[in-house]
């Protein structure tokens, strides 16, 4: 009996022993987490019976014991327990741990919001322990004025002239389904409200019921996407964030900026047309290596975004009509209202409107003006809807809004008139919010970037030159290509007609340009050329835009990704700027994109980070020499291996003079949810980007000392050499990578619309950056992040012990170096070589075991050296909050790691011996109709033994949720 009682000790109690103590007075994380877990375990018992719930607890306890002492025997015990489950139970247990991790993440988010609110209530911004990830706009303005002695006017001028353009991308998109994200949002809301101070007992009871309902609904939802998403699906998923948080979040944030300005003595608001925040998208425009993004997809995505924008404005315009009921107005507005009133039909009624459906009387002039705007918005939306659904529309284009100024003008007229009549307070209400939305989102909601590989343009040019019988463009030297392209750009003759012989690929490139020509130009942002290496890459796109009759050509942005391309980028840019035709074309403005993912895959994180830093400095020097304003577009991934990390720090650690109030950065699919998933997250994201961009411009970080640069150069050579000697030159590496990680099985997740490889055959170099990072994240070994650091530190310290002191100075005084080290330290805090060792024992052939051991030794050595450089005794000693959060998650993740390793073994070796005691534990409650076995039938086409594929995918999703950075 005592034994049974012991076994029933809940995870909740276990958690309380395991978890670190409270980090601060307002720390409610353990409380939140325990409540969610208790509720979930009760639900699990109701749905699947006590035995299965006990099994989940037993698994958790073994995992928690492993976390205490890291004894590999505990992992084997865990493995035995897991392999003793039958197929249905296996899915339920894996699903339970994946679900518990998602709940732990939600508890964290609510705790972060709770701490933030408390901090704001106290007006306390001194708590620097979380300044590593925070940047408050009010705090930044005060710091600039009171500490840096900048004048309030200087700060205001800098702020209203700066632009942050956030570019939402689809790859690899969420590894959590949207159906679940919505349920998670409701769990978050219930949890926040449950802990509100003034809650009544009845409210508490109802909220608790709602909480349980949402937890159960999420658990009962199939976590696995059964079909891969199309680019249109990805676009709709991305657009849902505008609908839910970004649309209302932008004016709310800009109001907070106004308030912060007031508090430093500026009695002006940020002008509504100041482009503080802009949004762009790659969803449906990024065709680099994704054959599913066709010209038709691009057209659909633009029409969809236009329809959504018109719909969002339309849904608000009646509220504005209610608000602006005044009769006083200036002469300009009265004349316009009279003209519109005169031209409208005498007894016109619009039965499809709910409010103001009859003709508006002239003594409500603002409503007359806004009524006309509403009519046009309605037709704009309907025209886009018909074009999208049927390919044609009976609504003439001239009856709709086709350009931004035409939409803005009547709204500005209302604003001016209200101010003229002494009603500025009214003008600065909903109308100002609406104007700010129009200035931010325009008629297209987001601007779509087009991205294509440079080789595809070369193929088109080659077809043209062969058709003209002047040779093969592909075989020409760079000089000859430039000479020919420029002669054509200066000339007027058309290059080709409909008789140009084309392949499917060439037609696809040309049709994309035709779609750009056909649609309004405000739909599009930049044309990005990936794998750009030379000036001809840019000139070729300029020529194709002209040939395809694009009236307002897109700005052309070269993307430099590989290490060699980054090194050659400044020279390529200087050559471009020295061409008179090109300088006239760009009108003093150029954008360059730098890629973090591929440079990291090519040379390792250390060398990539340093090369990206130097390349930016050199590119800025080139631009200054030619008096060109350069905007850097940062293609950062969501994970550290792909250039991710806390926004505020990442921006503040950029080289001086490289941002200058103009920043473009990708917000990767896998982090969109944690950036914009909820109102307070959206607010925090906009605040961090705006504040950090302002601070970088007004208080640039100091340049590194010459001796620091010299040391970095030495270390980068060593780090690249070690990284490449293992990843590209070690003959055992590819086999080891494929066996020790779920790389081969990654494609089953149906995460994104892009194939995992650029070319179907080939080694590591053909893998996209995501399937390269994702498998290492799954095994918690994170090799692409740390490989190279250890040998670089070791060699320079062995060479001269003074170098250790220099590295410590660099860490304390140079933001770039500190951020680079801190991010790797954070990855070490999430890593566990014990899991990699288990994978080796189960999945890797014995002759590769010494190689795995060698890599794990490098991991430990690198970690030790990193802590020496940072002068830390243990990882994350400077960030108790993050440390606590990671410790809470570890036991769940470890369970999923072990589950994954044993499942992979059974998938790859169907004859592998497993426990025979496979009686189903799961018992459905009397009310339930489907036993756990039915979960196996959700995947009838699996080529593996029942339940294995789903269990594997659930572990992948769970680990991704736990690591909070997918790939």
Curated annotation (Swiss-Prot):
It catalyses: oxaloacetate + phosphate = phosphoenolpyruvate + hydrogencarbonate. It is found in: Cytoplasm. It comes from the Eukaryota. PROSITE patterns: PEPCASE_1, PEPCASE_2. Residues 915-936 are annotated as: Disordered. Its cofactor is Mg(2+). By light-reversible phosphorylation. Belongs to the PEPCase type 1 family. Through the carboxylation of phosphoenolpyruvate (PEP) it forms oxaloacetate, a four-carbon dicarboxylic acid source for the tricarboxylic acid cycle. This is Phosphoenolpyruvate carboxylase.
